[in-house]
Amino acid sequence: MKRNLKILTLLCLAAVLLAFAGCSTGKTENKEPAKDYTLPEAVADVRDQAMDYVQDYAKKLEGGWTDRLEILISQNLGEATMNSSEYTALSATLTSYMKECGATYMYALVPDSEGSYYITVDGSEEPDTWGTDYGSEVQFKEAFEAGLVASARSGWQDGEGKWCWSVFSPLYNSNGNIVAILGIDYPAPVLADYPEWDRDSESWNGLDT
């Protein structure tokens, strides 16, 4: 009887161990694989090219052009600013640079008192209205607050379905103060092959910070 009881005890113990092992295996199988946020080389090449451009053009706009932008901002005329000859002149400079480097869009942003960024001068053929709210994104803050040449974490599609990658650089006045940021939306058709890096795609990886 004792021997049978001992055998029964051992069998019960074995059953418990097997059940525990089964539960552990099940937990391992249910683990989701870690997401890979490594930017593909082909996409990184586009981003890096755009960052070189925005840094170079911000340097060209430093001082004179940015001083004039600062004056326009200080006048606080809102949408009426776009009717001025000075706005037209500043916009023409951005349009020239935009065509020179092949950018899709080129514009200047400044933050408001709430930390949201709005557009000022826009070099596009159909410019956004002065004061259009662009919200607040980490790359805006990196450029304006930290003085960095900054990149968006993912690309996007404009209203015509064109893929773009956005980059930003601080704009300094003659006193060495950052008064705005220059933005370039650069063509990124390579995103057709990497939809996980397109925030307007259903396959987007969700990386935005």
Give the residues covered by each predicted segment.
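C-terminal motif of bacterial Sec signal peptides marking the signal peptidase cleavage site
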Residues: A19-G22
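Bacterial signal peptide processing site
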Residues: S24-G26
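Extracellular/periplasmic ligand-binding regions of membrane signal-transduction receptors
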Residues: D36-Y87
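Short N-terminal helix-loop-first-beta-strand/juxtamembrane motif that initiates sensory/input modules
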Residues: D56, T95-S116, S201-T209
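Extracytoplasmic/periplasmic sensor domains and loops in membrane signaling proteins
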Residues: D122-Q157
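A short beta-strand signature within small-molecule sensing/ligand-binding domains used
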Residues: G161-P170
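Short hydrophobic/glycine-rich mini-motifs in sensory/regulatory modules
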Residues: Y172-L182
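Helix-start (N-cap) segments at beta->loop->alpha junctions
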Residues: I184-S201
